[in-house]
Amino acid sequence: MSNKDIFVKISGSKKIREAREKVKSDTLYNLTSAVERLKSASYVKFDPTLEIVMKLGIDPRHSDQIVRGVVNLPAGTGKIIRVAVICKEEREEEAKSAGADLVGSINIIDEIKSGQINFDVCIATPDMMSMISSVARILGPKGLMPNPKLGTVTLDIKNAIKNAKSGQVEYRAEKAGIIHAGLGKLSFSDQDLLKNLNAFIGAVIKAKPVGLKGSYLKAIYLSSTMGASVQIDLTSI
């Protein structure tokens, strides 16, 4: 995928054309300027999400070049996150008290099998993974399968729920080494958006595969939902 393919083209209505005029596709921006530009170019009536696309110099088809992890965004995501906890009965009250929206075991598994997935994050205790394996093919493609590397298979239910609710974002490089994530609402203060951006970009940089040859960080683009897209000057990171 070329940089040109990644860049979001804006055309059509008058509002979109006006927004397009406020950003230049051939200009590189630092993070501060990029956030300012995207805010000034936003025209939608709802509160759009600040989105990031990172192109990495990796080949995810190779097991030693998989880039994946989670980031706790300092300012949160601005979204209401519904958390399901699959655990044994003796820990259900603990999960409920910690803020879980859906708690149980076989009842949740049955709902998943019937197509009822009313949660954004699924947390499980290790002793429930054999049961959850029966719905792995359903949860996996949706990015909802509990994973110890992501902190969603754990004995520390309380902390896992807290992280999920407070703005924990999962990232994973897909085909062509592309990572995409939402990092907060455009209504956030510039300072909060920059905190989230720096935390996310920093985490991805730290996740660079050991021994990778060549350039790791190829390009970064920021955009808002249905809005403009700007390319980041990598030398400013």
Curated annotation (Swiss-Prot):
UniProt keyword Nucleotide-binding present: no
Which is an annotated GO molecular function term of this record? rRNA binding
Recorded GO CC terms:
large ribosomal subunit
Domain of life, per UniProt, equals: Bacteria
Q: Name one GO biological process term.
A: regulation of translation
UniProt entry keywords in alphabetical sequence: Repressor, Ribonucleoprotein, Ribosomal protein, RNA-binding, rRNA-binding, Translation regulation, tRNA-binding
InterPro entries assigned to the protein according to its UniProt record, in alphabetical order: Ribosom_uL1_bac-type (IPR005878), Ribosomal_uL1 (IPR002143), Ribosomal_uL1-like (IPR023674), Ribosomal_uL1/biogenesis (IPR028364), Ribosomal_uL1_3-a/b-sand (IPR016095), Ribosomal_uL1_CS (IPR023673)
State the protein's purpose.
Answer: Binds directly to 23S rRNA. The L1 stalk is quite mobile in the ribosome, and is involved in E site tRNA release.
Describe the protein's quaternary organization and the partners it interacts with.
Part of the 50S ribosomal subunit.
What NCBIfam families does the record tag this protein with?
Answer: rplA_bact
Q: Which family does it belong to?
A: Belongs to the universal ribosomal protein uL1 family.
Name of the protein described by the UniProt record: Large ribosomal subunit protein uL1
Q: Which gene codes for it? A: rplA
